[in-house]
Structure formats: C-alpha cells, structure tokens
A protein has these predicted regions:
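Two-component/phosphorelay signaling modules centered on CheY-like receiver
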Residues: 8-30
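Receiver (REC) domain active-site loop signature in two-component systems and cognate sites
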Residues: 57
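Regulatory cytosolic signal-relay segments
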Residues: 103-107, 111-165
Length: 170
C-alpha cells in the first residue's frame, strides 16, 4: 500500500494505527510526499494494489496522480484522503477514477474499513483476471464443437440424469 501525503505526521499515524497488521505481514506500507515520488515508487514496486493519496501536495497534486495511476495500471485502486471534503473535490476525484474518498481529520476506524473493502475489491479483480486467462488457455485446447455441445441443454440434462443421490431415511 502506498501513502502519498506531504504531511509527515500522517506516516507516523499510519504506522501506529496499522502496526499489528504490519507486524503480521498483512500490510506493507510505502510512503511518498507528492505525486511525482508516488509514480517513481509505483514503477519500482509493482506489487502495490492500493494508494491512499492527499489532494493538495507540491510538485504533483493528488488529482493529477489519480489520472496517471489509471494509465499505469487498471488494477491499482486509489482512495483519496483529503481535508478538501467538499462535494466538488469529491466529484472530481470520483470522476477521475478514485475508488473512495476519506475526509481529514482521518477517522482511523473508517479508514481501516475502507482499506479492507478496497483490498477485497482488488482481490476480486485479480481473481477474475486469472479466471479469464485460464479460460482463454482452455479455449486454445478445446474444439469449438465441444464447447457448443457443452452449452446445450441436452448436455446439462445428461449430467443431471447420471447424478447419483444418496440419502439416509431416519
């Protein structure tokens, strides 16, 4: 997980709040102070799935970073964490692809729920992509006639007809 914020206090707070998950090895955090540093970290650390980013930062702001991340990888999800919680900034962030938005001052219970939800979403995306890859590999080896036969109702009925049901009457 990459945390992008120009306030160094947030790094300390994140490390304190998630220290148990860090010790367990469930979470690994990387930190950057602006969008440009974040891009460098993302190019170097290819296993990052989640970015927590502020909006207002020097060099490259969070909204610009959000646009650049979607160019890097469609899997990486961004949660904006910002004091700019007005509806305009929230709408801009969501329209540029933010997965969620958390307002500062950060409620860490809310942040933890948001992080868990985002990680689950990313895992579902990864599982779906893996299933698609496996299906594509299978399609290379299975004849089209077999696939069309398997999609017919007769095939499903024949499978059900051969099904053995065992039961015990008490």
């Amino acid at each position: 997980m990459l945390v992008v914020d120009d306030e160094s206090d947030l790094e300390l707070l994140i490390k304190q709040k998630f220290r148990r998950k860090i010790r367990e090895g469930s979470y690994e955090f990387f930190f950057a102070h602006n969008g440009a540093e974040a891009i460098q970290v993302l190019q170097k650390e290819t296993n990052i799935d989640l970015v927590l980013s502020d909006i207002n930062m020097p060099i490259m702001d969070g909204l610009t970073l959000l646009s650049k991340i979607s160019e890097l990888s469609p899997i990486i999800k961004v949660v904006m964490v910002s004091a700019y919680g007005d509806m305009d900034n929230i709408r801009i962030a969501m329209n540029r692809g933010a997965f969620d938005f958390v307002c500062k001052p950060v409620n860490f219970e809310d942040l933890e729920v948001t992080v868990e939800k985002t990680i689950q979403h990313v895992q579902q995306l990864r599982d779906t992509l893996q299933a698609i890859k496996e299906n594509n590999i299978l399609r290379m080896y299975v004849d089209e006639n077999v696939l069309s036969f398997m999609n017919r109702r007769e095939f499903e009925s024949s499978l059900m007809a051969n099904e053995v049901v065992e039961a015990t009457v008490v």
